Design a protein with these regions (language model features):
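Amphipathic, Lys/Arg-enriched alpha-helical "gate/interface" segment within cytosolic domains
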Residues: 1-118
Length: 118
């Protein structure tokens, strides 16, 4: 487990998944760090599912969204990942952003939006 004031990153062995739980707004290096560390775990353990808990999420800075799509997504696509799950309430103020990300992801992954992690 990797824990900061911005997020917690966990390897859920029983689900063969990485769980990234956002706690508060961050940008730049603090935003990018869990994706880099998660990518290492994906490679090491052949992880098939990435779960983002956006319950306490935030609207990304545009530069971070560009970085995510240009730098990390190609590496995720080349990895063992098959599924991406977003934990988010139906009435979340960030739903539009998550739906935008989903639109970019469905070409390469199974994508699910759930209100709680089971």
């Amino acid at each position: 487990m990797y824990n900061t004031k911005y997020y917690t990153l966990q390897h859920l062995k029983e689900k063969n998944a990485i769980l990234c739980t956002w706690k508060q707004f961050c940008k730049g290096e603090e935003y990018q760090e869990p994706f880099r560390y998660g990518l290492e775990l994906i490679k090491k353990h052949n992880i098939t599912t990435w779960i983002t808990d956006a319950t306490h999420g935030f609207e990304n800075e545009e530069a971070d969204t560009v970085w995510l799509l240009e730098e990390i997504m190609p590496k995720f696509i080349e990895s063992s990942l098959e599924k991406i799950v977003f934990v988010i309430a139906d009435d979340s103020p960030f739903m539009d952003e998550i739906l935008g990300q989903k639109g970019a992801l469905v070409e390469h992954f199974e994508v699910a939006l759930v209100e709680e992690l089971s």
